[in-house]
From Swiss-Prot:
This protein's name: Transmembrane emp24 domain-containing protein bai
Residue span, GOLD domain: 30-140
Classification lineage: Eukaryota, Metazoa, Ecdysozoa, Arthropoda, Hexapoda
Cytoplasmic compartment spans: 194-206
Subcellular location: Membrane
Cellular component per GO, a single term: membrane
Topological region Lumenal: 18-172
Amino acid sequence: MAKATFFYFLFIGYVWPIDSVMFNLAPNTQKCLKEDIQANQLVMGEYEVSDVPGQIIDYVARDTKGHILSQKEHITKGKFSFMSEVYDAYEICFISKVPPHQRGIPQEVSLVTKKGVETKSYEGIGEASKLKPLEVDLKRLEDLSDSIVRDFILMRKREEEMRDTNEKTNSRVLFFSIFSMCCLLGLATWQVLYLRRYFKAKKLIE
C-alpha cells in the first residue's frame, strides 16, 4: 500500500508541472519567452528581478499580432495574469534600460508561470467543498486528464489540417508538373514543325 501511495504521489508530481525559468538579462537588451497556448486559458505568472541602482526593467506580454495582454514598467517583484482569446504563440518579454552615462551590469530575472488547470487553487476548492486531501488530488487529476484530452484533440485537429494542406500542396505540385510537361511537349512539337518548314523552305529536306 505504501509503495502504491508513493507511485501515486510521484505521478501527481510528474504530471503537474509548473514552468519556471531564471536567466541573466544584459544591459539594454531584451529577452522573450514564447509558448503555444490554447484558446480561453488563464495564464498567471510571478516574476522577480534583482535590484541594481539606476537600471530599469520592463515587461510586456503579447500575442503574435502584437496585441498587448499585460504590461508593466520599472518592475522588481510582482504577478501578472491574462486570458488567451485564441490558440496562438504568446510571448513574455523583459526589456532592460540603462542610462547612457551608466555602465550597466546584468540583472537576474526569475519567472514562474502557470496556465489552464494549473492556475486553480485546489486547496481553496477542497476547503469550500470540505474534501479530503486525497479527494482534492483526485479532482486535480480529473481536471488535468480533461486538459490532456483537450490537448490531444487539438493536436489531432492540427495534424488533420496539416495533412489536408500537404495533400492540397501535393495535388497542386502534381498539376503544375503535368502542366509544365504539357507545355514542354507543346514547345518541342512546335519547334520540330517550325524547323521542318524552315528546312523545306531552304530545300534542305524534301
